[in-house]
């Protein structure tokens, strides 16, 4: 597999920046509408690490708030995890410059990660879990109803392939998820947005990007390989990532091998192969069969 092409995101003319912004605003607005990510009266914690994704997320939500037909509040939060040389002041200055209510947090998870993760292994999974725990506690303390994260389309499709190829499961990052402790709801308003658009926009806006490798962690080699595979496929067929994202929203359960699902479908007294709820072209289940899917999802959440 050849290495993906390196993309250079040059500063664009203002009319191009405006087009990028409109595309990102439209993607976020569609996701918010489709999955009811934000409601009237919500207080949203926007987790900002200092990377291109979270800066763009903050910008997009601030712009949407200006024109939204509902009333919601934003509070930007940055977490310094004790990584050597982490420049939290850069992020705080950005918060002050854009005039967003904000809070700076500190929790030395870095030393915990170093103790738990063997030398040479990627620290990202453990670091991410510890970071989520700190943010969850802070959100509850601050009275936030939602936590907004900056994951985008490419994150979702990469995770889909990682789960299928390395874990044997069809799943990805959901646009909306209640945390295991039941106290917090995580939302991903950029789930429809392309990483390429986000990177180009962040460059054009000259966001003060904080390096993501200050901890010295090894890269996640599996994710890196999947990203390279997607880049190679996209060179041949540019719609690949969009098609994979669409696949997450066009599931044909009767054409899968989930035995629990098939037992629930059978309990409706209808056979999707014989009763016309499915076709070989990928039509979606309707009526009672769709109700079975809802029951299955609820049963799995309770398990």
UniProtKB/Swiss-Prot annotation:
Question: Recorded E.C. number(s)?
Answer: 2.8.1.-
The record's free-text note on cofactor binding? Binds 1 [4Fe-4S] cluster per subunit. The cluster is chelated by three Cys residues, the fourth Fe has a free coordination site that may bind a sulfur atom transferred from the persulfide of IscS.
User: In which domain of life is the source organism classified?
Assistant: Bacteria
Entry keyword 4Fe-4S:
yes
**Catalytic EC class:** transferase
The positions annotated for binding [4Fe-4S] cluster are 124, 127, 215
Q: What are its cofactors?
A: Mg(2+); [4Fe-4S] cluster
Q: What catalytic activity does the UniProt entry give for this protein?
A: cytidine(32) in tRNA + S-sulfanyl-L-cysteinyl-[cysteine desulfurase] + AH2 + ATP = 2-thiocytidine(32) in tRNA + L-cysteinyl-[cysteine desulfurase] + A + AMP + diphosphate + H(+)
User: Its annotated pathway?
Assistant: tRNA modification
Where would you say this protein principally sits, based on its record? cytoplasm
Keywords in alphabetical order, please.
4Fe-4S, ATP-binding, Cytoplasm, Iron, Iron-sulfur, Magnesium, Metal-binding, Nucleotide-binding, RNA-binding, Transferase, tRNA processing, tRNA-binding
* UniProt entry tagged with the keyword Disulfide bond: no
UniProt-listed InterPro entries: Rossmann-like_a/b/a_fold, TilS/TtcA_N, tRNA_Cyd_32_2_STrfase, tRNA_thiolation_TtcA_Ctu1
Q: Where in the cell is it found?
A: Cytoplasm
Report one GO cellular component.
cytoplasm
* Motif PP-loop motif mapped to chain: 49-54
- One GO term (biological process): tRNA modification
Task: Give the family per the record.
Answer: Belongs to the TtcA family.
Function summary: Catalyzes the ATP-dependent 2-thiolation of cytidine in position 32 of tRNA, to form 2-thiocytidine (s(2)C32). The sulfur atoms are provided by the cysteine/cysteine desulfurase (IscS) system.
> What other facts are recorded?
The thiolation reaction likely consists of two steps: a first activation step by ATP to form an adenylated intermediate of the target base of tRNA, and a second nucleophilic substitution step of the sulfur (S) atom supplied by the hydrosulfide attached to the Fe-S cluster.
Quaternary organization: Homodimer.
PANTHER family, from UniProt?
AMINOTRAN_5 DOMAIN-CONTAINING PROTEIN (PTHR43686:SF1), SULFURTRANSFERASE-RELATED (PTHR43686)
Q: What name has this protein been given in UniProt?
A: tRNA-cytidine(32) 2-sulfurtransferase
**Organism listed in the record:** Anaeromyxobacter sp. (strain Fw109-5)
């Amino acid at each position: 597999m050849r290495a993906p092409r390196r993309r250079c995101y040059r500063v664009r003319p203002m009319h191009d920046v405006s087009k990028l912004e409109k595309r990102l605003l439209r993607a976020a607005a569609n996701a918010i509408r489709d999955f009811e990510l934000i409601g009237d009266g919500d207080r949203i914690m926007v987790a900002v690490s200092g990377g291109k994704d979270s800066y763009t997320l903050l910008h997009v939500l601030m712009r949407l708030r200006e024109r939204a037909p509902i009333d919601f509040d934003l509070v930007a939060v940055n977490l310094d995890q004790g990584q050597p040389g982490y420049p939290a002041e850069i992020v705080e200055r950005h918060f002050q410059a854009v005039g967003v209510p904000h809070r700076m947090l500190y929790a030395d998870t870095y030393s915990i990660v170093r103790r738990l993760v063997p030398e040479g292994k990627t620290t990202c999974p453990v670091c991410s879990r510890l970071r989520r725990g700190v943010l969850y506690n802070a959100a509850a303390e601050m009275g936030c109803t939602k936590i907004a994260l900056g994951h985008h389309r490419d994150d979702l499709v990469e995770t889909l392939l990682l789960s299928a190829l390395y874990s044997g499961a069809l799943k990805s990052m959901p646009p909306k998820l209640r945390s295991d402790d039941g106290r917090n709801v995580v939302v991903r308003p950029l789930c429809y947005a392309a990483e390429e658009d986000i990177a180009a926009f962040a460059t054009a806006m000259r966001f003060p990007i904080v390096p993501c490798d200050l901890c010295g962690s090894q890269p996640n080699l599996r994710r890196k390989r999947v990203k390279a595979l997607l880049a190679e496929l996209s060179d041949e067929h540019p719609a690949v990532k969009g098609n994979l994202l669409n696949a997450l929203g066009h599931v044909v359960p009767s054409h899968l091998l989930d035995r629990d699902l098939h037992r629930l479908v059978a309990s409706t007294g209808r056979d999707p192969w014989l009763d016309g709820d499915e076709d070989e072209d990928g039509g979606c289940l309707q009526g009672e069969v769709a109700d079975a899917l809802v029951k299955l999802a609820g049963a799995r959440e309770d398990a």
